[in-house]
């Protein structure tokens, strides 16, 4: 029965499918917001109205893309679908909690959208800094609704993280050690630990903001002995691990895709890859104040956060060069998924290089809150996380659906998207270096040319998104079924057929120990 299967589901595959569909839908909303932003900035002068509505759109774009697109698809969608299959578990450790994790997201999304409907909306940027987010600058219920939305999304992610950690540690076959797990499983494990440790800090920060707004506390109000910089510390102690949460599952997926389409039986430097992910996870927690170089920290504090941030480049470099070494000498198959993975490696590396630039506190003082920062994090998110999602989706689509995509269309779509995102975000480096600030709906005429180019790129990306929807429709309409996958011996998620049965294992999987 429909309601029993989809509303009360305790099946990891069905919940994963729900996450993928929800993430795709939210992705459309987030894309619409981004198109509105670029339409406003396409030429000087005003298009939508004042800066408040513009900033509401910018804030919503960030929240929707982060909490309702990337995290549900990567962790909820791919994680739920693949983790049990990859470790030979019958399902997740807590199947009903898994269902609740998903169903907390639509109400959360509803609250976020509602926040833009009351008063003037939440025009604070996704960081929600007080005093702008306080009850003077943002009177009314907007920010409160946004805070409740974040609370629900946070609870969802924390429960999900507990579920994944328990599943991965506890539900492997006895003969399978930590170091027999596929890299995607490792990436989700590290991601879940990061979520579990960082989200409670965000919850504390936004709850204090909520009481500051409604109960007359003064956590962030200097008049009552509070400090707005405390909020920044709490927010970024969550916010920096969060950006690694968004990219780590992508690392895992890219490792699988690169290995598969290079015809290799394993990625180069498995242990190095695992330790690199754990190092990135650890270091991600001790660099948060590099987002706050401009609030007036001591020179020695700035020196520490600069050098600690640069250290993250080392494990990241280990991963990039291990991917290249995996490619080396392989029988490379130029499938669309491989193209996405190679695009990921190239563009993520560019984003990493601009990250190294911004790690220097002296440079960041000048570049902070300019479009250089926007360009940097969109290179690692819009071309890192999104490219990984696209590659993973195309690679595992036959597993999820039992049908194959049209590879010609998929390659065309990759090309269109590649041109679109680069035309959108590469010029923003120049805008930032010329001093164009973020979060403004208008700009001096001197910035017109690069902004126009950037906005053209966003419309090309929109065409690519529409092409992807068409490709999925075409696959389900044509019903080209999968007969056999290659390299199944080293890619265990494919072993039970495409798609796998509703209940993968009627009895525990037997894994022979090599030791």
Curated annotation (Swiss-Prot):
Cofactor comment text: Binds 2 heme A groups non-covalently per subunit. Binds a copper B center.
Q: Which residues lie on this side of the membrane: Mitochondrial matrix?
A: 1-11, 87-94, 171-182, 262-269, 328-335, 401-406, 479-515
Which residues are listed for heme a3 binding in this entry?
Answer: 376
Question: Which terms does the UniProt entry file under GO BP?
Answer: electron transport coupled proton transport; mitochondrial electron transport, cytochrome c to oxygen
- Could you say which cofactors this protein requires? heme; Cu cation
InterPro entries cross-referenced by the UniProt entry:
Cyt_c_oxase-like_su1_dom, Cyt_c_oxase-like_su1_sf, Cyt_C_Oxase_1, Cyt_c_Oxase_su1_BS, Cyt_c_oxase_su1_dom
Give the binding site residues for Fe(II)-heme a: 61, 378
Q: Which UniProt keywords apply?
A: Calcium, Copper, Electron transport, Heme, Iron, Magnesium, Membrane, Metal-binding, Mitochondrion, Mitochondrion inner membrane, Respiratory chain, Sodium, Translocase, Transmembrane, Transmembrane helix, Transport
Localization annotation: Mitochondrion inner membrane
List, alphabetically, the SUPFAM superfamilies matched: Cytochrome c oxidase subunit I-like
Binding positions (Mg(2+)): 368-369
**Does this UniProt record's set of keywords contain Metal-binding?**
yes
Q: Name one GO cellular component term.
A: respiratory chain complex IV
Is Transmembrane one of the keywords? yes
- Ranges annotated as spanning the membrane: 12-40, 51-86, 95-117, 141-170, 183-212, 228-261, 270-286, 299-327, 336-357, 371-400, 407-433, 447-478
For O2, which residues are the binding ones? 244
Topological domains, Mitochondrial intermembrane: 41-50, 118-140, 213-227, 287-298, 358-370, 434-446
Q: Subunit info?
A: Component of the cytochrome c oxidase (complex IV, CIV), a multisubunit enzyme composed of 14 subunits. The complex is composed of a catalytic core of 3 subunits MT-CO1, MT-CO2 and MT-CO3, encoded in the mitochondrial DNA, and 11 supernumerary subunits COX4I, COX5A, COX5B, COX6A, COX6B, COX6C, COX7A, COX7B, COX7C, COX8 and NDUFA4, which are encoded in the nuclear genome.
Q: What does this protein do?
A: Component of the cytochrome c oxidase, the last enzyme in the mitochondrial electron transport chain which drives oxidative phosphorylation. The respiratory chain contains 3 multisubunit complexes succinate dehydrogenase (complex II, CII), ubiquinol-cytochrome c oxidoreductase (cytochrome b-c1 complex, complex III, CIII) and cytochrome c oxidase (complex IV, CIV), that cooperate to transfer electrons derived from NADH and succinate to molecular oxygen, creating an electrochemical gradient over the inner membrane that drives transmembrane transport and the ATP synthase.
What family does the Swiss-Prot or TrEMBL record give for this protein?
Belongs to the heme-copper respiratory oxidase family.
Q: Tell me which PANTHER family the record gives.
A: CYTOCHROME C OXIDASE SUBUNIT 1
- This protein is called Cytochrome c oxidase subunit 1
Q: Origin organism of this chain?
A: Elephas maximus
Gene (name only): MT-CO1
